[in-house]
């Protein structure tokens, strides 16, 4: 009997829950990211959902399947749970596939502020064709940091995120860093949201969808 009553209580908990549709930000076309259950809308706020750029844009070409986007619920209206960008990162498997023996891996981590006041932590990585000298690593790292900081300060949050995710920032780093030493690959491997401007905390950003 005790087992039956316990099973009934578990069943009752699930019957009290409802499903909320997770919605991507406007600059990602307000695409549906999935569903999450809760017995109270307030419990949905703060939850995170992970997807890939391929799933989000329905484009499985290039490296889109290796690019992960994590969104965080900030508002619930009716059955919809609206999310904001929380983190971008490349999968560990993809990064491991880029590592080669007798080559150099150069990384940089820098905190930046976009033109519209978003504070982000950006982690970039460069893979060289062969092992390079310490002085060359230092010069390449300086280029990586300079380009990331300058891009962030001249673009708004959505523009900067788009240029990082779609490869424009890595391409610019590649173009400049190869003058120091032959480069095999450049990636923005991670972007973390540290802080938003005050106005963004109460209303979602409005921008064109990322294509």
Swiss-Prot record:
One of its GO terms (molecular function) is structural constituent of ribosome. One of its GO terms (biological process) is translation. It comes from the Archaea. Pfam families: Ribosomal_S3Ae (PF01015). GO terms for cellular component: ribonucleoprotein complex; ribosome. Keywords: Ribonucleoprotein, Ribosomal protein. Signal peptide: none annotated. Belongs to the eukaryotic ribosomal protein eS1 family. HAMAP family: Ribosomal_eS1. This is Small ribosomal subunit protein eS1. It comes from Archaeoglobus fulgidus (strain ATCC 49558 / DSM 4304 / JCM 9628 / NBRC 100126 / VC-16). The gene is rps3ae.
């Amino acid at each position: 009997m005790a087992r039956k009553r316990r099973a009934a209580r578990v069943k009752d908990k699930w019957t009290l829950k409802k499903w909320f549709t997770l919605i991507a930000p406007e600059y990602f076309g307000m695409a549906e990211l999935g569903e999450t259950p809760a017995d109270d809308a307030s419990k949905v706020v703060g939850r995170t959902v992970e997807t890939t750029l391929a799933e989000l844009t329905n484009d499985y070409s290039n490296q889109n399947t290796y690019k992960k986007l994590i969104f965080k619920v900030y508002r619930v209206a009716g059955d919809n749970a609206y999310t904001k960008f929380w983190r971008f990162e490349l999968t560990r498997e993809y990064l491991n596939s880029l590592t080669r023996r007798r080559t150099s891996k150069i990384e940089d981590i820098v905190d930046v502020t976009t033109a519209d006041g978003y504070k982000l932590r950006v982690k970039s990585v460069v893979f060289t064709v062969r092992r390079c000298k310490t002085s060359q690593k230092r010069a390449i790292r300086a280029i990586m940091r300079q380009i990331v900081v300058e891009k962030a300060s001249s673009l708004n949050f959505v523009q900067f995120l788009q240029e990082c995710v779609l490869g424009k920032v890595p391409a610019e780093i590649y173009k400049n860093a190869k003058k120091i030493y032959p480069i095999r690959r450049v990636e923005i491997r991670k972007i973390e949201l540290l802080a938003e401007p005050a106005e963004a905390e109460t209303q979602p950003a409005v921008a064109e969808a990322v294509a």
